[in-house]
A protein has these predicted regions:
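Predominantly extracellular/luminal regions of secreted and cell-surface proteins
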Residues: 60-93
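Extracellular repetitive beta-rich solenoid segments
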Residues: 2-58, 66, 85-88, 96-102, ...
């Protein structure tokens, strides 16, 4: 139903599959139209811009029955400074044995800082999976956009060693608390 120009409640005929209801302004009947810009409600869609689903105090903003995350798998050994671009993947998996302790640097991408990408009060959670050989190494420093950050570690103790002949999975939750200000929660789990 909608309120027409004479303030009379009027009912609209049912729509056709694949159409969306579009307002025509106050007092005018809404119309069923094909979605603009090639967006189809019954086909796969890709968005490159930010989509906001705000929900309310009594409704969830988003409910997912299933979802996939992008995982970058690389035959690379963890060592030196590793740039983790959060716009590229949620999970980064290095399949060659780590060869030294490393720094992980979180950023949006090579051209966008994490500080620019995120708004205050937003968080992102990512995982870095590191293959370990008989000599194990560990993540000994964290930076965001090249600036040092001291994480808060699960259990309260910073990483001091890796786990030999395993896959160590590091999970980081990064919370933006202010301009270029972040809280990082870090944990590590051994898989063998």
């Amino acid at each position: 139903p909608y309120q027409n120009a004479a303030n009379v409640t009027t009912f609209l005929a049912p729509g056709t599959a694949g159409k969306v209801l579009t307002t025509q302004g106050a007092g005018a009947a809404p119309t069923w139209e094909t979605p603009a810009a090639g967006i189809s409600l019954s086909a796969d869609n890709t968005w490159t811009g930010t989509q906001s689903f705000t929900g309310s105090t009594s409704k969830l903003a988003e409910v997912l029955t299933n979802a996939g995350e992008v995982c970058t798998i690389s035959a690379t050994a963890a060592t030196g400074t590793i740039n983790f671009d959060v716009t590229t993947q949620s999970v980064l998996y290095y399949t060659s044995n780590a060869s030294a302790n490393w720094t992980v640097n979180f950023r949006g991408s090579s051209g966008t800082s994490l500080n620019t990408l995120m708004s205050v009060d937003q968080s992102v959670t990512v995982a870095f999976m590191v293959t370990q050989g008989s000599t194990a190494y560990y993540n000994n420093a964290v930076t965001i956009d090249g600036s040092s950050v001291t994480p808060k570690y699960q259990g309260g103790t910073a990483f001091a060693a890796g786990n030999a002949s395993s896959i160590d999975t590091y999970v980081y939750t990064i919370i933006k608390t202010g301009s270029a200000a972040f809280t990082v929660l870090a944990s590590r789990t051994q898989f063998k």
